[in-house]
């Protein structure tokens, strides 16, 4: 992704939706299943492979799996970008990872696996990223809350927690949510907004800023 003036990653609003097309999501499932097979791990990606110490083994297995299915990857898809998406799924937080890394995003709102919105510079917009179905979304929710010592399931379908960086997470899953899981992540601001920032975003007029200083 591009970088802000401070060297922090900034989310690119022009995310290629082709990377998250039905075809590519299905291909991602195939690759991930093959990675787990190579690593001799049963079940969905979990803390078994998300630990940082597993990263080199996961990368090697992923590279092998990508070589095996390279002929199925459309020519318009950048292999390195697809690889990064898969690594985020395997040891990160899936499609949320680039959004969480982006310095210009203050809030992430998820309304089911296909609807991910963000707030950036005071403006809300829909992203082009998607989860690989409701089960994928719920697995990422579990990956978020489990390290915090929290639990979410059908018997306890709502969780409110704070991440290590101060960001707030609220998640609701079925049956409490009727049309897929709902997640809101309010990111902790690494940089305090100045009056000039608020004026630039349109949240504050210059006369009002001058008045508040008096």
Listing of model-derived features with the role each one plays in the protein:
Residues 102, 110, 115-214:
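P-loop NTP-binding catalytic core
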Residues 1-125:
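N-terminal anchoring/assembly modules that precede and organize ATP-driven motor systems
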């Amino acid at each position: 992704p591009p970088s802000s003036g401070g060297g922090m990653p900034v989310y690119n609003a022009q995310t290629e939706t082709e990377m998250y097309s039905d075809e590519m999501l299905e291909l991602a499932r195939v690759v991930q299943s093959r990675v787990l097979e190579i690593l001799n791990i049963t079940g969905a990606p979990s803390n078994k492979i998300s630990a940082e110490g597993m990263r080199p083994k996961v990368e090697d297995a992923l590279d092998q799996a990508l070589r095996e299915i390279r002929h199925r990857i459309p020519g318009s898809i950048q292999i390195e970008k697809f690889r990064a998406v898969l690594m985020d799924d395997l040891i990160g937080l899936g499609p949320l990872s680039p959004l969480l890394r982006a310095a210009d995003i203050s809030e992430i709102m998820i309304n089911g696996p296909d609807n991910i919105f963000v707030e950036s510079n005071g403006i809300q917009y829909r992203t082009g990223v998607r989860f690989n179905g409701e089960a994928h979304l719920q697995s990422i929710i579990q990956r978020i809350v489990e390290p915090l010592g929290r639990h979410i399931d059908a018997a306890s379908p709502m969780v409110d927690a704070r991440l290590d960086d101060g960001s707030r997470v609220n998640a609701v899953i079925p049956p409490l949510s009727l049309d897929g899981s709902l997640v809101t992540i309010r990111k902790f601001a690494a940089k305090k907004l100045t009056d000039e920032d608020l004026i630039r975003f349109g949240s504050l007029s210059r006369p009002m800023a001058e008045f508040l200083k008096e």
